[in-house]
Amino acid sequence: AAGEFKDEISPYEIVSHQPDLADGRRILTRNTVAEHDEGPRADTSVEGLAKLRPVFRNGQFGGTVTAGNSSQMSDGAGAVLLASAQALKDYGLTPLARFVSFSVAGVRPEVMGIGPIAAIPKALKQAGLTQDQLDWIELNEAFAAQSLAVIHDCGLDAAKVNPLGGAIALGHPLGATGAVRTATLVHGMRRRQQKYGMVTMCIGTGMGAAGIFEAL
């Protein structure tokens, strides 16, 4: 995916100040330019992931959730600009995509994580679309098990889901994920000359959200 995220990341400089442990009277200043997601790890291998132990177990059943198939702790920020047709005209802006529909729905809190199963059909109905018309699906994967459940229950085309990787590979900065996933979707569809895409994610306590976008 070299260069795939270039258009959606705005590099910025971070200035950090730390005491010099060898000389307590000095403060060291370091300048770092953040221009890549912190999540991807080039040294990750299938063999290494297979060695990780499950975090949860239920009686005699072996667990499936490991540090390797769960989203990591991430720092991040994201922003999108949502404008009306009149605002686009007034300020001379060229839109990248059209926000077609949005829905929020919920499932029982004890099965939190599969909220998108309830939200996706509502968003598609509002947009007047079917799943077959979606070219790209950004499904936030807090855990691989959660994503697989949504793909299975909704009958999503796995080949269209997270084609550039999801939160497990890239990170899941809470509060920024919606904007980040939307940026990936919109820029990706425009590069590939695709038309319709969806961003969906689970939210704590059983909620789920889904949004449909049309690339312009």
Which residue stretches match the model-derived regions?
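Cysteine-centered functional microenvironments
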Residues: 61-71, 102-103, 135-142, 161-177, ...
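Active-site-proximal alpha-helical scaffold in enzymes
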Residues: 1-4, 79-86, 151, 173-194, ...
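N-terminal extracellular/periplasmic Venus flytrap/periplasmic-binding protein-like
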Residues: 1-85, 90, 153, 158-160
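Active-site pocket-lining segment
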Residues: 12-15, 100-169
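Short acidic, glycine/serine/threonine-rich loops at helix termini
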Residues: 22-25, 93, 110-112, 173, ...
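Hydrophobic alpha-helical scaffolding
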Residues: 35, 39, 109-113, 172-175
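Condensing-enzyme catalytic core mediating Claisen C-C bond formation in acyl metabolism
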Residues: 44-114, 118, 122-125, 183-184, ...
